[in-house]
């Protein structure tokens, strides 16, 4: 599982459209929020905290927030639009359409019967200069506690 000291996998991720490839910053501090699936109730309750607290995160040195879901880019774009302020927000909604990032980050689980075979565990990771420096992993993927925006923000 993703852990402190982990480096980011070198895989292709997308935002907004298939031609828009996402590259995580190699320098500075940012947050990756791993979610099992766009539009699911727990995920849709977790993400607004990151959008609402974007300025507070920036004040603590966070240069970006990247919500990564094992969904296609059209789904993640629509999900971003579904949030009040989502379109104006600087929070990135990133598609890991084939789960390659999730697998390489060792953050996947089998969600067969509900969401499909591979989904991401729910976590938040603070990354600094390409390495994970803090990680917040939920014990159950339906929980939104340990990886909530408030908990991550208070740890910075």
UniProtKB/Swiss-Prot annotation:
Q: What is its main location?
A: cytoplasm
Keyword vocabulary terms for this entry: Antioxidant, Cytoplasm, Disulfide bond, Nucleus, Oxidoreductase, Peroxidase, Redox-active center
State the superkingdom.
Answer: Eukaryota
- What GO cellular component entries does it have? cytoplasm; cytosol; mitochondrion; nucleus; peroxisome
Start and end residues of each Thioredoxin domain: 2-156
Q: What else is known?
A: The active site is a conserved redox-active cysteine residue, the peroxidatic cysteine (C(P)), which makes the nucleophilic attack on the peroxide substrate. The peroxide oxidizes the C(P)-SH to cysteine sulfenic acid (C(P)-SOH), which then reacts with another cysteine residue, the resolving cysteine (C(R)), to form a disulfide bridge. The disulfide is subsequently reduced by an appropriate electron donor to complete the catalytic cycle. In the typical 2-Cys Prx5 family, C(R) is provided by the other dimeric subunit to form an intersubunit disulfide. Pmp20 lacks the resolving cysteine residue.
Q: What is this protein called?
A: Peroxisomal membrane associated protein 20
**The species this protein was found in:** Schizosaccharomyces pombe (strain 972 / ATCC 24843) (Fission yeast)
